[in-house]
Amino acid sequence: MKVAVLGAAGGIGQALALLLKTQLPSGSELSLYDIAPVTPGVAVDLSHIPTAVKIKGFSGEDATPALEGADVVLISAGVARKPGMDRSDLFNVNAGIVKNLVQQVAKTCPKACIGIITNPVNTTVAIAAEVLKKAGVYDKNKLFGVTTLDIIRSNTFVAELKGKQPGEVEVPVIGGHSGVTILPLLSQVPGVSFTEQEVADLTKRIQNAGTEVVEAKAGGGSATLSMGQAAARFGLSLVRALQGEQGVVECAYVEGDGQYARFFSQPLLLGKNGVEERKSIGTLSAFEQNALEGMLDTLKKDIALGEEFVNK
């Protein structure tokens, strides 16, 4: 199983590469790519960690050598948020980066599963889909927007509030991956109940958690370490499913039946071909139903922006 990380010299990329080097199954290959010249050195640094995961690093304009034979490609390349910016302010720079890298994936490893981490995910996934479609290699079961950070944040905040072990809590999060489009389904957490005020406050905190980190880092970056952990969790789940493990479920932002929007984050059963089954979002509370209806315009606009970027 070969995993490629594109944007591997950045804050998310390095954290993700470290976690994959220590946690991928024995015999896996890990390939690191970034435009920055430090990338081969990041691979050498990680190669000294004693795990049976082969690692190589590549830098420069051409990602091809890193992508050859990849089964999973995780894309975290791009610029990070600064205070006062929201994820959509990143669009102008990151849209071009994602388009370029996905074109290279389409050429070199068209059958790979692709996880898009680069923000704004609501839009960059639509860009990736349109690029793959133009290249004639789009498979909607193999393209994912990685929203796992919303899930792990939800798990952490709920566990803190309710005095639970974080590992015991699993909150499904649907919708998209920014602001109001992030919808934690708190009504579906087994064995935990919330007051209306708690639901309102928690939902808001989960939606704004990225901004909390950006402000706390005081201009020195955005959420890189928790995002690295979230991306590793998703990537490792995907690898396990591709290798035939049964019953692997993760939420991610994918193209589905279009009931709510062309792309939508929901629980997915993963398998040997990527998405095996898009699972139902279940019964929503009145608060959640309202929030879902209220976000769809924003989500659809984000998606249209990505489609237009490629097709203009």
UniProtKB/Swiss-Prot annotation:
NAD(+) binds at G7, A8, A9, G10, G11, I12, G13, D34, N94, I117, T118, N119, M227. Changing D71N: In strain: EC47, EC49, EC50 and RT272. Its EC number is 1.1.1.37. It catalyses: (S)-malate + NAD(+) = oxaloacetate + NADH + H(+). Disulfide bonds: none annotated. Pfam families: Ldh_1_C (PF02866), Ldh_1_N (PF00056). Substrate binds at R81, R87, N119, R153. One of its GO terms (cellular component) is extrinsic component of membrane. The active site is at H177 (proton acceptor). InterPro entries: L-lactate/malate_DH (IPR001557), Lactate/malate_DH_C (IPR022383), Lactate/malate_DH_N (IPR001236), Lactate_DH/Glyco_Ohase_4_C (IPR015955), Malate_DH_AS (IPR001252), Malate_DH_type1 (IPR010097), Malate_DH_type1_bac (IPR023958), NAD(P)-bd_dom_sf (IPR036291). One of its GO terms (biological process) is anaerobic respiration. Changing V249I: In strain: RT083. GO terms for molecular function: L-malate dehydrogenase (NAD+) activity; malate dehydrogenase activity; oxidoreductase activity; protein homodimerization activity. It comes from the Bacteria. CDD domains: MDH_glyoxysomal_mitochondrial (cd01337). Keywords: NAD, Oxidoreductase, Tricarboxylic acid cycle. Belongs to the LDH/MDH superfamily. MDH type 1 family. Homodimer. Catalyzes the reversible oxidation of malate to oxaloacetate. This is Malate dehydrogenase. It comes from Escherichia coli (strain K12). The gene is mdh.
